[in-house]
């Protein structure tokens, strides 16, 4: 068998199946590789073995070689430990961004080269174009499925060695193609959420690694409302899981998380989704990553997303001396959350992004002041 020039990341889902089929139909020399990034705990929550069987079946139908690699150790060291540390520090991380940077476009790419390939392909909904002497990361044609948000940490070296064969397709088109070509994954449900959590209750999963520290739930006026099982388990804007029943002299309206103070172990809530405590017009990020290798300018305007699938928000970006960003939004933003990703766009092009460090929301300023006083519970 000839040495493959392209290794396709086979997840066992319909997206990677069609990606492999399209390349194969173009007579590219390809092979498939299934990555195991998490060691199953025996509860079958990740469906990893089922996904592996589906990947094997698709490779068999296409007549291409199948490879398997276990990256669970790398995932634990480079993604999961960071995930836990962020929650322990009161932030809400985005492990998919790290997984792409550290696993799929680092270890997987290295493995593909060891197998003799010079490029990799994945089933991401994004596009890559080369013009003006550099590679550009663009949104996928299907905006409802676009995954450039999770790919903003990629750089020129990775883009030069990567193909996104389904980036020009709508999801409905893709499923039709899969059905017409007889791929066994054509009707398979899309995976959602974080694989290592699967279908389990998020709080129960996190308790295995971060011990519960119950404390008070208070309103903005410091009035005690109820008790919480641990501030780690909640994020800004969260409504579900608070277990706040009827509160005396309060209307029967839903409660929303508006902040958390690790120093006092207090979770703050309010009954208004548009609470001023959830509003911000400014944020500061950690040092940014730029797809091109450098920012467009010291100060520039663009659009931003502070969460996946958020509508584009106009903003002004100032690059600080340490590489971090000050971002001023044209409109007030809701529940901008430290630890999440700020991703910047110029039209359909993803410029890059950074982890959100802090905002000008009232309780977030308090959290930032107290964070340095709090010991890391993982130590």
Swiss-Prot record:
GO terms for molecular function: ATP binding; tRNA binding; tRNA-uridine 2-sulfurtransferase activity. It comes from the Bacteria. GO terms for biological process: tRNA wobble position uridine thiolation. ATP binds at residues 9-16, 35, 123. It is an enzyme of class 2 (transferase). Its EC number is 2.8.1.13. Residues 145-147, 307-308 are annotated as: Interaction with tRNA. InterPro entries: MnmA-like, MnmA-like_C, MnmA-like_central, MnmA-like_central_sf, Rossmann-like_a/b/a_fold. It catalyses: S-sulfanyl-L-cysteinyl-[protein] + uridine(34) in tRNA + AH2 + ATP = 2-thiouridine(34) in tRNA + L-cysteinyl-[protein] + A + AMP + diphosphate + H(+). Residues 94-96 are annotated as: Interaction with target base in tRNA. Pfam families: tRNA_Me_trans, tRNA_Me_trans_C, tRNA_Me_trans_M. Keywords: ATP-binding, Cytoplasm, Disulfide bond, Nucleotide-binding, RNA-binding, Transferase, tRNA processing, tRNA-binding. It is found in: Cytoplasm. Catalyzes the 2-thiolation of uridine at the wobble position (U34) of tRNA, leading to the formation of s(2)U34. Belongs to the MnmA/TRMU family. This is tRNA-specific 2-thiouridylase MnmA. The gene is mnmA.
């Amino acid at each position: 068998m000839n040495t493959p020039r392209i290794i396709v990341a086979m997840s066992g889902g319909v997206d990677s199946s069609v990606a492999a089929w399209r390349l194969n139909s173009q007579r590219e020399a390809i092979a498939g590789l299934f990555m195991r990034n998490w060691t199953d705990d025996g509860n079958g929550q990740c469906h990893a073995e089922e996904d592996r069987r589906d990947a094997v079946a698709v490779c068999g139908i296409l007549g291409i070689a199948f490879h398997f690699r276990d990256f669970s150790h790398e995932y634990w060291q480079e993604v999961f430990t960071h995930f836990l540390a962020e929650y322990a520090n009161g932030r809400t991380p985005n492990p998919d961004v790290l997984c792409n940077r550290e696993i799929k476009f680092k270890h997987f790419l290295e493995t593909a080269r060891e197998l003799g390939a010079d490029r990799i392909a994945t089933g991401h909904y994004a596009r890559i174009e080369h013009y003006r002497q550099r590679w550009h990361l663009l949104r996928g044609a299907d905006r409802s499925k676009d995954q450039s948000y999770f790919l903003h940490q990629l750089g020129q070296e990775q883009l030069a060695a990567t193909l996104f064969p389904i980036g020009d397709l709508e999801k409905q088109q893709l499923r039709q193609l899969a059905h017409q070509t007889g791929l066994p994954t054509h009707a398979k449900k899309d995976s959602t959420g974080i694989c290592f959590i699967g279908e389990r209750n998020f709080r129960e999963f996190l308790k295995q690694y971060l011990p519960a520290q119950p404390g008070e739930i208070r309103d903005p006026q410091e009035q005690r409302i109820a008790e919480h099982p641990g501030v780690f388990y909640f994020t800004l804007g969260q409504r579900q899981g608070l277990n706040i029943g009827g509160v005396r002299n309060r209307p029967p309206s839903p409660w929303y998380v508006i902040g958390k103070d690790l120093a006092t172990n207090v979770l703050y809530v309010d009954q208004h989704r548009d609470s001023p405590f959830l509003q911000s017009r400014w944020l500061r990020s950690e040092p940014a990553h730029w797809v091109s290798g450098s920012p467009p300018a010291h100060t520039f305007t663009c659009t931003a997303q502070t969460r996946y699938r958020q509508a584009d928000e106009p903003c002004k970006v100032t690059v600080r001396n340490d590489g971090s960003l000050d971002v001023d939004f044209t409109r007030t933003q809701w529940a901008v959350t430290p630890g999440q990703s700020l991703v910047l766009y110029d039209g359909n092009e993803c410029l890059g992004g950074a982890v959100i460090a802090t905002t000008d929301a009232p309780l977030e300023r308090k959290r930032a002041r107290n964070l340095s006083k709090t010991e890391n519970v993982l130590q």
